[in-house]
From Swiss-Prot:
CDD domains: TS_Pyrimidine_HMase. The gene is thyA. (6R)-5,10-methylene-5,6,7,8-tetrahydrofolate binds at residues 174, 267. It catalyses: dUMP + (6R)-5,10-methylene-5,6,7,8-tetrahydrofolate = 7,8-dihydrofolate + dTMP. This is Thymidylate synthase. GO terms for biological process: dTMP biosynthetic process; dTTP biosynthetic process; methylation. The keyword Lyase does not apply. Keywords: Cytoplasm, Methyltransferase, Nucleotide biosynthesis, Transferase. NCBIfam families: PRK01827.1-3, PRK01827.1-5, thym_sym. It comes from the Bacteria. GO terms for cellular component: cytosol. InterPro entries: Thymidate_synth/dCMP_Mease (IPR045097), Thymidate_synth/dCMP_Mease_dom (IPR023451), Thymidate_synth/dCMP_Mease_sf (IPR036926), Thymidylate_synthase (IPR000398), Thymidylate_synthase_AS (IPR020940). Its EC number is 2.1.1.45.
Length: 268
């Protein structure tokens, strides 16, 4: 008897398509929108890289490594053939104090900076039961300086029985283009934190606020939902010297057999 493949993302995508309320949005494209949803993935069993369409994993890892560099310029991304941030960059490639800057160099009132990622890792090692182990990109005082305000703005780390779980809050969730990318990114980050802290992986829990499908993605969504899901792959993570020393070659996806890519326009 065939094993039932769980499809939390596809189930939510179908819900938004069938139950979403028509809404306007910042980009002028228009959406179907549903407010408040949660997806759960057991990272010990598999890696949540969607199979109902091919997800650009090189781009997922490139962006994540770029965040962990604390970078605000697209130059490093472009050098590594990742162009997903080009639309928002200015003529010099700058984006302002976006995700990576807040993660690695959150400014304090006295002129110092906090490396939230290092603090989070230290907390995992020294106080794993802490309920205060969060990383935020939502710096209210700097939002207006950012080319794009954070969509996935907060994550919390949780340890039980030697397993690390992560919960992510995403205020604005582009269900077709953005969320598949974000799921894989935070799943990879959970593996990295766990490996560096000497823990096993637990769950990735994704919580979405405004979960939406853009009007010009509806046909693509219908095509994706018509496809039969396949087994999720596994992630083999080669250990780096530190959380900040991982490179593209350290991430090996095993058994990834997705349906073909489905093209769609990004709403800027």
């Amino acid at each position: 008897m065939a094993t039932m493949i769980e499809t939390p993302y596809e189930d939510l995508l179908r819900r938004v398509l069938e139950e979403g309320a028509p809404k306007g949005d910042r980009t002028g494209t228009g959406t179907l929108s549903l407010f408040g949803a949660q997806l759960r993935y057991n990272l010990a069993e598999s890696f949540p890289l969607l199979t109902t369409k091919k997800v650009y994993f090189h781009g997922v890892i490139g962006e994540l490594l770029w965040f962990l560099r604390g970078d605000s310029n697209v130059k490093w991304l472009q050098e590594n053939k990742v162009r997903i941030w080009n639309e928002w960059a200015d003529e010099d490639g700058e984006l302002g104090p976006v995700y990576g800057v807040q993660w690695r160099s959150w400014p304090t009132p006295d002129g110092q900076h906090i490396d939230q990622i290092q603090v989070a890792l230290d907390t995992l090692k020294n106080n794993p039961d802490s309920r205060r182990n969060l990383v935020s990109a939502w710096n209210v005082s700097e939002l207006d300086k950012m080319a794009l305000m954070p969509c996935h703005l907060l994550f919390q780390l949780y340890v039980a029985d030697g397993k690390l779980s992560m919960q992510v809050y995403q205020r604005s969730a582009d269900m077709f283009l953005g969320v598949p990318f974000n799921l894989a990114s935070y799943a990879a980050l959970t593996h990295m934190f766990a490996q560096q802290a000497g823990l096993e992986v637990g769950e990735l829990i994704w919580t979405g606020g405004d979960c939406h499908i853009y009007n010009d993605h509806i046909e693509q969504v219908k095509e994706q939902l018509s496809r039969q899901p396949r087994e999720y792959p596994q992630l083999k993570l080669h250990k780096a010297e530190s959380l900040f020393d991982y490179d593209f070659d350290d991430f090996e996806v095993i058994g990834y057999d997705p349906h073909p890519t489905i093209k769609a326009q990004v709403s800027v």
